[in-house]
């Protein structure tokens, strides 16, 4: 009678645990990177919306000799033929608390405030990557004097 040497093949429990830990680490790293990319994309969309509002406000100033009192002047459907018209899908009117309590739900949320002397305006948007509100000024708007909404 001959005996066969049977070699146990397979993985030990320790080897399986090591593989599971490595997979978990890779998952966490990829999720963190993905969230960072999402925040960069949202910030880019918010900045684009703010740039669009700033450009349309300048066009409004050229056509009407004053800056719009609020975003509604730029998004008025009755003015859709005007060069300063801004589609409501492009921008969402909103306000930001200082400091911001929470990020806006929509990336294209913009706060627009015309200056008291109507020679410029402040356009604010949320930077999702840095969790802060950023501001862009159009025209010759003094930093501390704003009115309207």
Language-model segments: residues:
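Short, low-complexity, Pro/Ser/Thr/Gly-rich segments in the mature regions of secreted, periplasmic
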Residues: 129-149
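C-terminal juxtamembrane segment of a hydrophobic transmembrane alpha-helix
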Residues: 23-41
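Extracellular/periplasmic head regions of type IV pilus-like filament subunits
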Residues: 62-130, 148
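N-terminal leader/signal peptides at the extreme start of proteins
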Residues: 1-11
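N-terminal signal-anchor/signal peptide hydrophobic helix marking the start
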Residues: 11-21
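Residues within membrane-spanning alpha-helices of integral membrane proteins
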Residues: 21-22, 49
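Membrane-proximal N-terminal amphipathic helix
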Residues: 39-67
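Conserved Walker
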Residues: 12, 29, 44
């Amino acid at each position: 009678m001959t005996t066969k040497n049977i070699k146990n093949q397979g993985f030990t429990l320790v080897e399986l645990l090591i593989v599971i830990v490595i997979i978990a680490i890779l998952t966490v790293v990829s999720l963190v990177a993905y969230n960072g990319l999402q925040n960069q994309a949202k910030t880019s969309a918010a900045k684009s919306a703010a740039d669009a509002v700033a450009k349309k406000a300048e066009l409004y100033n050229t056509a009407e000799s004053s800056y719009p009192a609020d975003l509604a002047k730029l998004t008025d459907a009755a003015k859709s033929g005007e060069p300063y018209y801004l589609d409501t899908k492009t921008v969402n009117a909103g306000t930001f608390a200082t400091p911001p309590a929470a990020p806006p739900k929509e990336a294209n949320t913009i706060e627009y405030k015309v200056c008291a002397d109507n020679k410029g305006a402040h356009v604010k948007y949320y930077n999702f990557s840095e969790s802060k509100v950023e501001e862009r000024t159009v025209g010759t708007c003094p930093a501390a004097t704003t009115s309207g909404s």
